[in-house]
């Protein structure tokens, strides 16, 4: 009887240990994703400061889609380049800021970032602001934006 109880306790301890290890791996993955997101966000708007679309395009996965308000979904690197040109040339974006409010997920393959954004013109004036959800994807090149959805806080 004591033998069965002892074996049961050992098996339970092993199972709980495995569960804790999985959670630790997931927490490590999430922390790595958060760090990569912060690094990517820190250089995202350099593309507008330098008028360099390659910086912008490199933030996105090859199969990414940008889902801007009141527009059709734009997918792929060519679409990202077109979006950059429109933001720079038509809207006059020259800088901006992301404020991440939360990152959700396990950090294994996908995580979701929630936050706020601000857009500035050549004079450094705020001309638009809003909120966003970005689904990030872990790729061989690192964490990249996979789905980028945002909307303005301004009235249409």
What residue ranges belong to the model's regions?
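Bacterial Sec-dependent N-terminal signal peptides
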Residues: 1-28
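Short, low-complexity N-terminal intrinsically disordered segments enriched in polar/charged residues
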Residues: 18-58, 156
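Hydrophobic/aromatic beta-strand elements that line small-molecule binding cavities or substrate pockets
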Residues: 84, 98-103, 115-119, 131-137
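Short, cysteine-centered beta-strand-loop-beta hairpins and adjacent loop/turn segments enriched
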Residues: 91, 119-126
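A short, structured loop/turn motif at beta-sheet edges
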Residues: 103-110, 124, 137-144
């Amino acid at each position: 009887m004591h033998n069965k109880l002892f074996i049961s306790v050992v098996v339970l301890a092993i199972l709980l240990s495995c569960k804790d290890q999985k959670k630790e791996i997931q927490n490590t993955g999430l922390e790595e994703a958060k760090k990569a997101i912060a690094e990517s966000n820190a250089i995202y708007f350099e593309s507008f400061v330098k008028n360099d679309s390659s910086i912008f395009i490199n933030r996105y996965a090859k199969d990414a889609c940008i889902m801007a308000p009141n527009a059709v979904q734009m997918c792929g690197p060519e679409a990202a380049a077109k979006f950059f040109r429109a933001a720079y040339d038509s809207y006059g974006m020259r800088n901006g800021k992301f404020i991440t409010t939360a990152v959700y997920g396990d950090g294994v393959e996908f995580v979701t970032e929630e936050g706020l954004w601000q857009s500035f013109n050549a004079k450094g004036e705020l001309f638009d602001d809003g909120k966003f959800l970005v689904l990030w994807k872990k790729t061989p090149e690192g964490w990249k934006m996979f789905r980028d959805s945002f909307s303005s806080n301004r009235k249409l």
